[in-house]
Amino acid sequence: FYGQWKKTGFGEKGWAKVISNGKMGDGPWGNVFAGKAKGGDAVSSLKPASDEIKLAKGFEAELLYTVPKKEQGSWVSICVDDKGRLITSDQGGRGLYRIDVSQEEAKVEKLQVDITSAQGLLHAFGSLWVNVNGKGAGVYRFTDTNGDGSYDKKESIKGLNGGGEHGPHALVLGPDGKHIYVVGGNMTKLPQMDRSRPPTNWGEDHLLKRLPDARGHARTIRAPGGWIARFDKDGKNWETIAMGFRNTYDMAFNIDGELFAYDSDMEWDAGTPWYRPTRFYHVTSGADFGWRTGTGKWPQWYP
């Protein structure tokens, strides 16, 4: 019946019975209109990982390490290096950490690099690639030139203009093993590219006047909004793959090499006609997923 309710003379005959999934405010989301979400029961103490995670048959979850927030911050990105160790980054100014989980007890060391606030980490092509969000935003490459376990060479690959929760985000190795994919939120200005798959003549024209966000969020941000691009193993030949995202944080390829991403809309717009619920995107080449500021975003039924 999708779309038929707009037609003259439409009747409700044939509609299925309404199914209730719970009252507004039930977990896990909480009441989004109450000012403070309280969905579900608060976790008063740390539980084993298996008690917190739903696992498929045959899988197990193990708690490896509990991050002391006061000393090591809030870890917001993670990757695996060429020796199977984890590398993570604090969201703020507490730096990068390397975690060896090969023994019964995890060994954690702070990396001696002058960088922090990485929301994208990837070890590929013999180097650590870092996407910094905030001061000094941009993509960097760190290399251990003498094999002593320390990253002694730092290179700025491309500076980015953006930061905060909608700034530069994930780095992912492409399925061809030759390219690195990078994503930027809608407050990350699209940098100079060598080529673009989406047409670059995007516009902001509307038949009806747009209503900007009443609280001022992203009022001055215009197309292309959030974007996904890629570059080669030397950090060159940047190419825009898709655009029109709001704040996609991460992405992944399936076994067939198809790219998928996850996005969300402004949470305080929930219940309005222009709200677009959280969703997965099948990121096809050259796509524009239609985020525009305020009420100017493209409706879900646009092709």
What function would you assign to each model-found segment?
Residues 1-39:
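Accessory carbohydrate-binding/adhesion or oligomerization-edge regions at the termini
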